[in-house]
């Protein structure tokens, strides 16, 4: 309990000191990495699964993952952007886990123009993330975790380097089949700026809860995002600035259905994505996502699909194997 109180105190102090404005660099850090989390509305910090990619969303969840899992991920994002990832997990003693992962984003070739708009050539853009995660079971109900990040972006002739950390805590009560989490994501700063102007990382404070139903193979999830700011400056306003509209933009909901003990079907809805990217002329499915997962003795597979706009979507696949 003493370790837990120290961890909570450090987490709260760090959040209060490092809350940052939304005009931040390295926006790729907000993309989902777990196909399961992506299928539940694009983010989830409270489901407990043997899925190493979930530790990207909440480092405390790594304590639920098996040791010696080698995992790979791929996402096609908005058609021309490809995201590749790989990671590995290992137990450290009886109550702690260590994980490492790397992610590479390739935006492809783009036209390079001068100040007058004349095309003068092509340039490439890429982002790279190296991350290490440590998680620890404080007790039978509480787990905490921390992730350290080395972040690199290169766009044409300019590049930037940053250091960041994520802090997470999870509470689980098996009697009520209830899991609750709190995460402070992307604390840190640039160590090499693009043009000598310091830009913050995309800080996010999240809370989440997941509950298994007692008499049905269903789990419901609620995730709250951007809790450190009520109305973010980057909320795109379509004219509805009411209290209820702003509240909904902080909410992500999701549901898992378990047809068998080793499969899941999931779906989610992101209110903010729907509000800001919806087609105003016809009813479409912006903000909706869905996925499927299969777990065998040594192999785990997950696939998700998310709709962001009438002309843009994402497809993500995770694969893990026990060595």
Model-identified regions with their sequence ranges:
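Bacterial Sec-dependent N-terminal signal peptides
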Residues: 1-23, 255, 323
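Subset of outer-membrane beta-barrel
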Residues: 20-323
């Amino acid at each position: 309990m003493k370790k837990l109180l120290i961890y909570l105190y450090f987490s709260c102090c760090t959040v209060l000191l490092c809350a940052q404005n939304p005009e931040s660099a390295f926006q790729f850090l907000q993309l989902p990495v777990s196909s399961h989390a992506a299928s539940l509305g694009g983010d989830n910090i409270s489901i407990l699964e043997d899925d190493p990619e979930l530790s990207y969303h909440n480092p405390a969840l790594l304590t639920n993952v098996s040791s010696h899992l080698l995992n790979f991920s791929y996402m096609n994002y908005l058609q021309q952007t490809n995201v590749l990832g790989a990671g590995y997990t290992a137990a450290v003693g009886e109550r702690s886990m260590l994980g490492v992962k790397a992610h590479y984003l390739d935006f492809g070739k783009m036209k390079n123009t001068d100040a007058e708009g004349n095309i003068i050539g092509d340039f490439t853009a890429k982002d790279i993330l190296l991350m290490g995660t440590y998680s620890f079971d404080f007790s039978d109900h509480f787990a905490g975790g921390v992730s350290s990040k080395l972040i690199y972006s290169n766009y044409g002739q300019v590049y930037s380097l940053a250091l960041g950390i994520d802090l997470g805590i999870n509470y689980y009560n098996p009697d009520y089949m209830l899991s609750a989490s709190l995460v402070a994501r992307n604390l840190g700063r640039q160590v090499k700026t693009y043009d000598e102007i310091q830009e913050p990382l995309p800080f996010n404070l999240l809370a989440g809860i997941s509950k298994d139903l007692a008499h049905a193979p269903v789990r419901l999830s609620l995730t709250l995002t951007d809790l450190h700011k009520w109305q973010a400056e980057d909320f795109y306003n379509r004219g509805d600035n009411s209290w209820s509209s702003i509240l909904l933009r902080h909410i992500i909901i999701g549901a898992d259905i378990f047809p068998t003990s080793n499969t899941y079907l999931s779906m989610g809805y992101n209110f903010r994505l729907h509000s800001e990217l919806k087609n105003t002329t016809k009813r479409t499915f912006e903000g909706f996502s869905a996925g499927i997962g299969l777990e065998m003795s040594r192999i785990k597979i997950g696939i998700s699909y998310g709709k962001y706009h009438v002309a843009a979507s994402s497809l993500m696949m995770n694969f893990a194997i026990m060595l």
